[in-house]
């Protein structure tokens, strides 16, 4: 694979100098700062990420445990928040008489989060990492509080939007913190540990939400974030988190806000993202895909995005998304790979429960238990692969293997029928989860290993945006595939049943609206439609394999910069 060019290295040095004129750029030929990659065909030396610049050594021991526990809990809560509301929604709509607002309970969070994510990269690049992370989490907690005390559906939607604003900077902030705390070869293990445990929030969210809704009140779906947030505050408040590059202090912060955050770029990007996501939300649901509203939103998003690209090109290295960074093969392929990975994860997370609830006839809580094999195997492989990458140094084999295994796993899901045995759906899910887990963190490691410290926060933000963008897009595609297929298959397998009555009834209530003699045909139509959705996931998994080839064959075990001496506290 092509390694970073000399031109890119010169650009990196220029960006560091431009961002911090009081410092000289790092000597790219210094032995301690360069790791020569033997596997590169051109033998070009690769600048290795530097360590903390605030005079502190890498974080170890109990302080590292406290930091990792804190950021893992925060990421867990954020992912829990995305799924816990699903089982509480029926009770919420009954209390507020707000069935037409159901879509906004999820999309308000998504719109606010996706539109802010790129700006969070500039925030972490220019401001104190620890306090930026804590601030985003505080906003997330405020949103949770607003949702918990909501007295109307509109107040709940506002609370979800506020929580989304806070959530926009949590994951990329966690990855940036890990990059500043430990050397490169230790990051895969810690990143895998964080992602492995945090993503348990996705699967246990519906279980906890169902329990709260049934035995206490749906408001505890949001209140639960508050006491855990207090624990996180105690874990992080008194621990120093090293910085990978100098950050401004005092009055210079005002200069950074005005000149370095690229607020114009944000003002152009945010409406483009919101219009695009709204078009996906409305299309095929509230409005037809060929309606003037949906077409207008797509056109508005495209026009605004063109203006955003032109502005970013004009801003150069001070742009919210620097052109010199996004043109790097490792960066853009990492973004695409992570986006496709999240697409496969979300498609399975949404449609496996539909298979179990609609076709197998189980309730929401039990369907959450039934998808545990994929989530647990994913978490286990994320932790194991991270440890092994740190030990042997190469991330690309894991990403390629993950794409292959995930493709096979999704392919096996397309064979599901109403009579699929327990052993098969457990085994297929284990294979699927293992494939996703093996490659889940590799795009993050690839980007961090190939970028200088000033660009790591921006790259993490861009990768997180691709997570939202690809996830939303593929879920919309999946919805179109499922709905159209269900209409066609109902005509084939249950011709006496009106397709629209089944679609309107929903995945859990259609059994009551179907005559007993027609139910087997309806179940078969449902099963075939879910199978077609998994074909889409197969395509996304294959794409992760293809684009992984561009992430580069690099050994992360390069020489680290000399550690600062002294007995300063971490």
UniProtKB/Swiss-Prot annotation:
The cross-references to CDD domains, in alphabetical order and at most eight, read: MFS_Azr1_MDR_like
Q: Does the keyword Protein biosynthesis apply?
A: no
The induction comment states: Expression is positively regulated by the azaphilone pigments (MonAzPs) gene cluster-specific transcription regulator pigB.
Q: Which residues cross the membrane?
A: 65-85, 99-119, 131-151, 162-182, 192-212, 221-241, 263-283, 293-313, 336-356, 369-389, 392-412, 425-445, 455-475, 533-553
The disruption phenotype is: Does not affect the production of azaphilone pigments (MonAzPs).
Gene Ontology terms, MF aspect: pigment binding; transmembrane transporter activity
Q: Which residues are glycosylated?
A: 290
By its UniProt entry, which SUPFAM superfamilies does this protein fall under? Answer: MFS general substrate transporter (SSF103473)
An example of a Gene Ontology cellular component annotation for this protein is:
plasma membrane
Q: Where in the cell is it found?
A: Cell membrane
Q: How does it sit in the membrane?
A: Multi-pass membrane protein
Q: Which UniProt keywords apply?
A: Cell membrane, Glycoprotein, Membrane, Pigment, Transmembrane, Transmembrane helix, Transport
Q: Which PROSITE patterns match?
A: MFS
Family stated for the protein in its record: Belongs to the major facilitator superfamily. TCR/Tet family.
Question: What is the recorded name of this protein?
Answer: MFS-type transporter pigP
């Amino acid at each position: 694979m092509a390694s970073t060019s000399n031109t890119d290295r010169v650009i990196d040095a220029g960006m560091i100098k431009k961002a911090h004129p009081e410092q000289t750029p790092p000597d790219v030929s210094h032995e301690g700062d360069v790791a020569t990659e033997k596997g590169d065909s051109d033998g070009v030396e690769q600048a290795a990420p530097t360590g903390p610049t605030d005079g502190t050594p890498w974080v170890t021991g109990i302080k590292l445990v406290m930091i990792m526990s804190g950021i893992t809990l925060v990421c867990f809560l954020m992912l829990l928040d995305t799924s816990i509301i699903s089982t509480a929604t029926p009770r919420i709509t009954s209390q507020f008489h707000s069935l037409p607002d159901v879509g906004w309970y999820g999309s308000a969070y998504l719109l606010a989060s996706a539109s802010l994510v790129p700006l969070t990269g500039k925030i972490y690049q220019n401001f104190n990492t620890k306090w930026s992370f804590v601030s985003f989490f505080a906003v997330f907690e405020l949103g949770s509080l607003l949702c918990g005390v909501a007295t109307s559906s509109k107040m709940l939607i506002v609370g979800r939007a506020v929580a989304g604003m806070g959530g926009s900077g949590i994951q990329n902030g966690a990855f940036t913190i890990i990059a500043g705390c430990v050397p490169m070869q230790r990051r895969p293990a810690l990143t895998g540990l964080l992602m492995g445990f945090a993503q348990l929030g996705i699967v246990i969210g519906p279980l906890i939400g169902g329990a709260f809704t049934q035995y206490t009140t749906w408001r505890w779906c949001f209140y639960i974030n508050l006491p855990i947030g207090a624990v996180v505050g105690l874990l992080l408040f008194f621990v120093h988190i090293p910085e990978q590059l100098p950050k401004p202090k005092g009055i210079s912060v005002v200069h950074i806000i005005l000149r370095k955050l690229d607020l114009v770029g944000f003002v152009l990007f945010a409406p483009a993202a919101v219009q695009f996501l709204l078009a996906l939300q409305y299309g095929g649901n509230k409005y037809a895909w060929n309606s003037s509203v949906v077409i207008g939103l797509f056109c508005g998003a495209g026009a605004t995005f063109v203006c955003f690209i032109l502005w970013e090109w004009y801003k150069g290295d001070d742009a919210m998304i620097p052109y010199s960074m996004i043109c790097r093969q490792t960066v853009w392929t990492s973004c695409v790979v992570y986006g496709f990975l999240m697409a496969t994860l979300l498609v399975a997370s949404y449609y496996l429960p539909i298979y179990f609830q609609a076709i197998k006839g189980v309730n929401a809580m039990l369907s959450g238990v039934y998808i545990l094999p994929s989530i647990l195997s994913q978490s286990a492989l994320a932790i194991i692969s991270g440890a092994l990458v740190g030990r042997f140094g190469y991330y690309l084999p894991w990403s390629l293997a993950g794409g292959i295994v995930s493709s096979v796993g999704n392919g096996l899901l397309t064979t599901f029928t109403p009579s699929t045995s327990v052993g098969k759906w457990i085994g297929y899910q284990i294979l699927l989860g293992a494939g996703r887990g093996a490659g889940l963190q590799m795009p993050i490691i690839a980007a961090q290993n190939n970028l200088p410290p000033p660009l790591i926060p921006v790259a993490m933000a861009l990768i997180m945006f691709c997570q939202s963008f690809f996830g939303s897009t593929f879920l919309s595609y999946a919805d179109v595939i499922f709905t159209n297929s269900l209409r066609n298959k109902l005509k084939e397998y249950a011709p006496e049943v009106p397709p629209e009555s089944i679609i309107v009834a929903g995945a859990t209530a259609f059994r009551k609206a179907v005559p007993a003699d027609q139910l087997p045909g309806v179940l078969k139509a449902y099963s075939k439609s879910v199978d077609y959705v998994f074909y889409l996931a197969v395509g996304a998994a294959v794409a992760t394999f293809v684009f992984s080839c561009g992430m580069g064959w690099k050994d992360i075990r390069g020489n680290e910069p000399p550690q600062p001496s002294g007995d300063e506290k971490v």
